[in-house]
């Protein structure tokens, strides 16, 4: 069973359908007992960082996620950004699960970064075109396992311990997106 954290901001239905299409049972929850029973936890998200953190703190999700060390915790789009320490969007602290910060995209290309872009990585699964929609990005770091070139390097997939971030929308990225999501649900792209 996969637990999708429902904190009130997210593309829950599309992510749910994608995970079910992969053959997993899904539960939408904010309940610690459900999360503890799950094989993996997914934190989806669209919208504003500050609003998302307010909702997460209101529902006591932050401490629950900080105590998960034995299974994948996957953030998608805004969910990936929430995993980090701080965001310039609203100048607010994140979940502080992954070292680093979220900053505005600095590119000569149009913002938001919208549409298909190729991932670059040494991991063979992470070398495909995927669908992005965002104006903020994680800073480049040693935790980036795939990035896209958009006039600057845009982290597309990060992994730090059991925390995996996917900046693009795997549920909107066709077969490759589903394969990437499935690999994340199984534990990610690096071996510790």
Swiss-Prot record:
Keywords: Amino-acid biosynthesis, Cytoplasm, Glutamine amidotransferase, Histidine biosynthesis, Hydrolase, Lyase
Keyword Transport carried by entry: no
Catalytic residues in the record: 77 (nucleophile), 169, 171
GO cellular component entries: cytoplasm
PROSITE patterns per the UniProt record, alphabetical: GATASE_TYPE_1
Cross-referenced InterPro entries: Class_I_gatase-like, GATASE, Imidazole-glycPsynth_HisH
Location of the protein in the cell: Cytoplasm
Glutamine amidotransferase type-1 domain span: 1-192
Pathway: Amino-acid biosynthesis; L-histidine biosynthesis; L-histidine from 5-phospho-alpha-D-ribose 1-diphosphate: step 5/9
One Pfam family here: GATase
Highest taxon listed in the record's lineage: Bacteria
GO molecular function: glutaminase activity; imidazoleglycerol-phosphate synthase activity; lyase activity
Catalytic activity: 5-[(5-phospho-1-deoxy-D-ribulos-1-ylimino)methylamino]-1-(5-phospho-beta-D-ribosyl)imidazole-4-carboxamide + L-glutamine = D-erythro-1-(imidazol-4-yl)glycerol 3-phosphate + 5-amino-1-(5-phospho-beta-D-ribosyl)imidazole-4-carboxamide + L-glutamate + H(+); L-glutamine + H2O = L-glutamate + NH4(+)
Record EC number: 4.3.2.10, 3.5.1.2
Keyword Lyase included in the entry's annotation: yes
GO biological process, one term: L-histidine biosynthetic process
Function field: IGPS catalyzes the conversion of PRFAR and glutamine to IGP, AICAR and glutamate. The HisH subunit catalyzes the hydrolysis of glutamine to glutamate and ammonia as part of the synthesis of IGP and AICAR. The resulting ammonia molecule is channeled to the active site of HisF.
HAMAP family assigned: HisH
Matches recorded under PANTHER family: IMIDAZOLE GLYCEROL PHOSPHATE SYNTHASE SUBUNIT HISH
Subunit structure: Heterodimer of HisH and HisF.
Protein name in the entry: Imidazole glycerol phosphate synthase subunit HisH
Species: Staphylococcus epidermidis (strain ATCC 12228 / FDA PCI 1200)
Gene this chain is encoded by: hisH
